[in-house]
Amino acid sequence: MQITEIFRSIQGESTHAGLPCIFVRLTGCNLRCVWCDTAYAFHGGTKMSVEEILASVNELSGRAVGQAFQPVQQPSSAEGQARKPVLQAISLVELTGGEPLLQPEILPLSEKLLAAGYTVLIETSGERFVGALPKAVIKIVDVKCPDSGESGTFEMKNLDAVDAKDEIKFVIASRRDYEFARDFTREHELAARVRQVIFSPVFADPEGKWPALDARSLADWILSDRLPVRLGLQLHKFIWDPAMKGV
């Protein structure tokens, strides 16, 4: 597999935002969104086997290769009942890109991560069919809005391939994008199909290539239309330099 980077960070997006997470960024993408903030993953990368990737994830997570997650026994509560064990390792892994579904080895990689006890997220552009992924994988599927330059690339079969644990995300750069996302959400009853529908405002490019969408404007639109969606901000860009890689 071609891998751009593997790193440990705080999950910045989705309903898992704020949690420690291991990211595996795969190299290559067949789309060219105007506001893409990971264009460095289009080319290059390092060739790694599934076993090498798993070993790297285990190391970053705090686990030894082949070991199960080790619980820390908590003191009993005041009622005398044992509390839920706390894991000593990071158990959340996201496979992202680029477009991770371009590499067929994504299937055995996700299966091995699941078998090792990880919770696995896959973030995808929505252009590729997600139905072949293991059932336990949590799919975060984009629908590209008009200002991305890639509107119309969404694989409509994905609407029937997602379920109540998955998420659908729209990255929104303008009022036009918002209206597209709003209408798509309503027409296809997305809130009834997935765990969460996420509207995420575009973050300004550090080099000024594109502007931000004011999050307050997006919040006002969502509230005005009473949409059953989550406003999603890129938390990691508030913690670290927005241009920084590996976070």
What are these regions (language model features)?
Residues M1, R8, P20-C21, R32-G80, ...:
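Conserved Radical SAM active-site core
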Residues I10-C21, G28:
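S-adenosyl-L-methionine
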Residues S14-A17, V34-D37, A243:
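Short, glycine/acidic-enriched capping/hinge loops at junctions between secondary-structure elements
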Residues H16-G18, P71, V162:
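A generic structural micro-feature
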Residues V24, G28-L31, M244:
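Disulfide-bonded cysteine motifs in exported proteins
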Residues R25, T96, I198:
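Conserved Rossmann-like nucleotide-binding pocket used by diverse enzymes
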Residues T27, G97, I172:
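Conserved residues at beta->alpha junctions
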Residues L101-V247:
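Conserved AdoMet/S-adenosylmethionine-binding subsite of the radical SAM
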